[in-house]
Amino acid sequence: MSMLKPSGLKAPTKILKPGSTALKTPTAVVAPVEKTISSEKASSTPSSETQEEFVDDFRVGERVWVNGNKPGFIQFLGETQFAPGQWAGIVLDEPIGKNDGSVAGVRYFQCEPLKGIFTRPSKLTRKVQAEDEANGLQTTPASRATSPLCTSTASMVSSSPSTPSNIPQKPSQPAAKEPSATPPISNLTKTASESISNLSEAGSIKKGERELKIGDRVLVGGTKAGVVRFLGETDFAKGEWCGVELDEPLGKNDGAVAGTRYFQCQPKYGLFAPVHKVTKIGFPSTTPAKAKANAVRRVMATTSASLKRSPSASSLSSMSSVASSVSSRPSRTGLLTETSSRYARKISGTTALQEALKEKQQHIEQLLAERDLERAEVAKATSHVGEIEQELALARDGHDQHVLELEAKMDQLRTMVEAADREKVELLNQLEEEKRKVEDLQFRVEEESITKGDLEQKSQISEDPENTQTKLEHARIKELEQSLLFEKTKADKLQRELEDTRVATVSEKSRIMELEKDLALRVQEVAELRRRLESNKPAGDVDMSLSLLQEISSLQEKLEVTRTDHQREITSLKEHFGAREETHQKEIKALYTATEKLSKENESLKSKLEHANKENSDVIALWKSKLETAIASHQQAMEELKVSFSKGLGTETAEFAELKTQIEKMRLDYQHEIENLQNQQDSERAAHAKEMEALRAKLMKVIKEKENSLEAIRSKLDKAEDQHLVEMEDTLNKLQEAEIKVKELEVLQAKCNEQTKVIDNFTSQLKATEEKLLDLDALRKASSEGKSEMKKLRQQLEAAEKQIKHLEIEKNAESSKASSITRELQGRELKLTNLQENLSEVSQVKETLEKELQILKEKFAEASEEAVSVQRSMQETVNKLHQKEEQFNMLSSDLEKLRENLADMEAKFREKDEREEQLIKAKEKLENDIAEIMKMSGDNSSQLTKMNDELRLKERDVEELQLKLTKANENASFLQKSIEDMTVKAEQSQQEAAKKHEEEKKELERKLSDLEKKMETSHNQCQELKARYERATSETKTKHEEILQNLQKTLLDTEDKLKGAREENSGLLQELEELRKQADKAKAAQTAEDAMQIMEQMTKEKTETLASLEDTKQTNAKLQNELDTLKENNLKNVEELNKSKELLTVENQKMEEFRKEIETLKQAAAQKSQQLSALQEENVKLAEELGRSRDEVTSHQKLEEERSVLNNQLLEMKKRESKFIKDADEEKASLQKSISITSALLTEKDAELEKLRNEVTVLRGENASAKSLHSVVQTLESDKVKLELKVKNLELQLKENKRQLSSSSGNTDTQADEDERAQESQIDFLNSVIVDLQRKNQDLKMKVEMMSEAALNGNGDDLNNYDSDDQEKQSKKKPRLFCDICDCFDLHDTEDCPTQAQMSEDPPHSTHHGSRGEERPYCEICEMFGHWATNCNDDETF
């Protein structure tokens, strides 16, 4: 590669993020801090080398991420005109770019608008980066890290090592960053270490964004200090911005930008910067007491900050040793020297001994405190290491399972690819066989055409018996041609399937490659993890004491307690969610009932539509009967015409006149009926969309019947013409009369053809409207389905959001409780001694661990939610694919129908061509006969004048026919206008229907909102009802008792009444019997009648009592039902009360658990105080054992070393956790890749659909041109018939001339010569006309053949060369320019369309009005004027 210009890219930072992975440590990296500025200046030259390495690694077509968050594919790599150096052009997946592949009028690649972007290769990554890396902190220079606050430390620690910036950074290792060694910390630089620790705490962007508040002290760009005055979004740029009031006039404004004020300050003191460029400053404590008390904390803070920066094990051990030395110096060496000096001064006297004893006791207390601190840290480290080892084991198992699954998937994909390859080979074999068959068929067709020519020559000699053979051969040829077409379509289908299989194999191979890459990466990561595990195994804590083990066990018990608490909370939350889900299911059931109502309404509308369809079918049946009667009358008229051929001229003319009047009447009736039907369709189309389908089907049947009748008429006409030819040979005298009849028949045929054309136009327009209606129905269905899916998704989202809100509220409540408890504990712990401080540190560590656990759980939940959303999007894309495939199948079926229609048209054209050939042969025979006759005889001038008169008469007839043609065309145009009006009305009705649909949709949405409001009100009412329930229960109980008592009373009363009625019935029956006996005895009519009346009264009374009994039974049943319902309600209320009581008990249990924890903490504090007293007692004993303390110091140092090792292991485990998080991100990226692949497949399907639509439009145009050619052929046929008639007239005139010559022999030879010359000239003229007509016929045949071949092969470019006689010599013409956006030819191409250009081609002229003496701001990063390097946006792209 050629040497590149220095791009001014920043050197990578030496600060390591907490989320980054562990890297290789350099062997020898030593450079003073004073040389950082020179290394920064020198970084411009090696940056070109890094760019070369980036360009070498990346390739065109590779999948990358711009700044770690914008996915796309590389389409360009190299130098550009708009800026020096190497640039990469990327096509993004989403329209969030800046161009369409062209910048400043120069095109580097082609893509959709706002999807193209140009960046430096160093900004590209092959994986999705974390947020802090993607925001641009990856490439901040070392000069920014050295703030004004830490200049003192930089000056004092001049010998601290720093890595050189010349080492390039490859993109294949995106997480690789250079470690920076931390300077040694001395006792003199406490304030500097405090400021450095404060700055290091604000290292991560996320923390900075969370902690920034208005009024905070911050640094902008690492150099400008100030106070935050504004936080939020602005009008001048997108994203979150921070408005800072600087300490010095180094800003750009006074708090206002572009006329809008965000805060108030002095001019040049205001500055706006993105949030990720602003870092918070912490202030060190100034009081000496606090500094002495928190010396250990400061040292720990500095060591942790330095550990975060340096990943290497050597730097970590050195920092831990430095920290231990710093913490131990004031306690051991300093005090020892002081005691020795005091012993030297005050040897004599008891006071000196007492002071020495006090100092030693203080020294022992400090040593004990440090020992306790170290023990606590070791315990924490061991517990943390155990947990991380368990997590590592789980991660290893998961990784092994994932690897096995990936291998299984790989095997499946390989089998799939092999099967696809086999299918491909089989399809290729089939293609070759089909091609062979096609070639054989073409050879057969050529042979048949040769034999056809021979047979036609023979048919001139023998007429009748061989005509049948020729017809059979023609039929064979047609069958062969049809089979050829079938084989061609088969071949086309096979080719398409081959292309589809190729695309599928390519996509599967790319998937396999990606999976193999992922496998290799995973295997490497596993190997690295194993190596680290083997290298970082603990050496075995042999010297750990029993006290440490006891503390570990106590901590484990606390952890178990917290876990049980968490599990209880989770179970309570699950129960809460279950209740919520039940309520949601009830709401869904209510919605289902509403949908059922709507479906019933739809069914009623459908029944109305069916009724309307029946009415329309009756109208069509009437119209059909009328058409049939008209066709029958037309056929009768044709038969009468045939009969009238044998009769005289007068009767024929009258019949023709009658026929014409009848036809005109028929046309008028037909037009009136069509107008009536159109009016009906206009009025009913909006309400009855399905009527059109039935009408169209029946119309098609009618048209087919008409076409059949027309074909029958044509066949009859052909037979009549044959008869006329026979009669011409027999009787030459009746030729003139027959010519007139034939002309009239031709006029009728022309009119029939016009009618057929009009009908064809109608059918084509009806088909177009049908297709539009189908498309509209499909779109409506798709929109309704999409809307329903959207509603479902919205409901699910709302439910999920509600659940999340409830969880957040509960979390906040618990966190507030926990914070209040921790505050109380801290207040108590401040009063305790150094041991209580150790306890507080333990609790802080525990809290940090819990926070980390919560963060990890939240990340895991987010990842699972994202995976679910990705799966949903995948399912949606699959559904869309299925819909597209269905549309594709519909269009392909339409294409096949159109091709079948073309084939039918071509068959008709071929039949007409055969007829033309027969006529041409007959014409040639006649011409030969005329030539022979003209040679033999002469003609007179009188005959010539007669000929001219006849010609004039025929020309007049032609003019009259042309006038009739124009009238017919006007009628056709009128019909077309009426059809257009119909289409406009149909579109209006469709628009109205769409509007109605939208209104209904809005009403449904309103109803939904009303239902939601009702649900809220119902919830409130439920709460009120719960309050009222307790009152209502007591009231209902009392009412129940009263009602039961009343019912019992009524039952007793009714039973008494029943008994009385029964007794009365029995008494009455006895009386009846007595009366009957008396009636028998008396046998009188009056007494019998009286008895009958009494019987009737008794029966009436009995029926009344029975009815009252039934009424009482019904009332009893009703009351029992009411009792049952009240009991059920009572049970429900009791259940709800029990649930509320259970919730109260759960909350009480939580409160008791919190109280128990507080009590345990109090007990722990008491135990610690007891331990303190015990330790004070032990201090006296330890004073005697000062000699042994030195050995303990050495053991203490060993413990410190072990602690440093454990700290290193902790850091490495954190790094591994970050690696696992990155693995999850990579899995997300792979899912996004699969989504992009599906979207690409969708775009391909859309492109195929557009191609098919274009082919359909081309075929329709070709159909129209074929119809126009058909009309031209018919006019030529009519001209041919006229010429044949002229030839026959000439033959008759020749015969008459011969007779006259035989009679008049006295004419002179000179006149005969002149007549012969005149006749010869006429014959030459006629011959030239015939030759011209033949040429026209040949040209038209060529055009028709070209059109048919183009329609079959799908190539429209061959039609440009049909006019050329020598096609082989001429070169093909260039294709015409066509714009798909504007739909116009010859203006411009789609790539050069002005509507596509969204940005101005020429950049605007820059005018600068500054003074020449001022220094213009220049950025070394962008290599542009207008701003300084400190104000540069790192994420700048083109």
Swiss-Prot record:
Residues 350-1353 form a coiled coil. Detected in dendritic cells (at protein level). Highly expressed in the Reed-Sternberg cells of Hodgkin disease. Keywords: Cell projection, Coiled coil, Cytoplasm, Cytoplasmic vesicle, Cytoskeleton, Membrane, Metal-binding, Microtubule, Phosphoprotein, Repeat, Transport, Zinc, Zinc-finger. A zinc finger (CCHC-type) spans 1417-1434. Residues 129-188, 302-340, 987-1006, 1298-1319, 1395-1414 are annotated as: Disordered. Phosphorylated. Phosphorylation induces conformational changes by increasing the affinity of the N-terminus for C-terminus, resulting in inhibition of its function thus decreasing its binding to microtubules and DCTN1. Exhibits a folded, autoinhibited conformation when phosphorylated and an open conformation when dephosphorylated with increased binding affinity to microtubules and DCTN1. Phosphorylation regulates its recruitment to tyrosinated microtubules and the recruitment of vesicular cargo to microtubules in neurons. Residues 993-1006 have a biased composition (Basic and acidic residues). PROSITE patterns: CAP_GLY_1, CAP_GLY_2. The modification Phosphoserine is found at residues 48, 143, 147, 195, 197, 200, 204, 310, 312, 315, 348, 1236, 1364. Pfam families: CAP_GLY, CLIP1_ZNF. One of its GO terms (molecular function) is tubulin binding. The modification Phosphothreonine is found at residues 50, 140, 182, 1310. Residues 136-150, 1300-1310 have a biased composition (Polar residues). InterPro entries: CAP-Gly_dom_sf, CAP-Gly_domain, CLIP1_ZNF. One of its GO terms (biological process) is cytoplasmic microtubule organization. Residues 151-168, 304-332 have a biased composition (Low complexity). Its main location: cytoplasm. It is found in: Cytoplasm; Cytoplasm, Cytoskeleton; Cytoplasmic vesicle membrane; Cell projection, Ruffle. Residues 78-120, 232-274 form the CAP-Gly domain. Residues 97-101 are annotated as: Important for tubulin binding. One of its GO terms (cellular component) is intermediate filament. Binds to the plus end of microtubules and regulates the dynamics of the microtubule cytoskeleton. Promotes microtubule growth and microtubule bundling. Links cytoplasmic vesicles to microtubules and thereby plays an important role in intracellular vesicle trafficking. Plays a role macropinocytosis and endosome trafficking. Intramolecular interaction between the zinc finger domain and the CAP-Gly domains may inhibit interaction with tubulin. Interacts with MTOR; phosphorylates and regulates CLIP1. Interacts (via CAP-Gly domains) with tubulin. Interacts with SLAIN2. Interacts (via zinc finger) with DCTN1. Interacts with TUBA1B, MAPRE1 and MAPRE3. Binds preferentially to tyrosinated microtubules, and only marginally to detyrosinated microtubules. This is CAP-Gly domain-containing linker protein 1. It comes from Homo sapiens. The lineage of its organism: Eukaryota, Metazoa, Chordata, Craniata, Vertebrata. The gene is CLIP1.
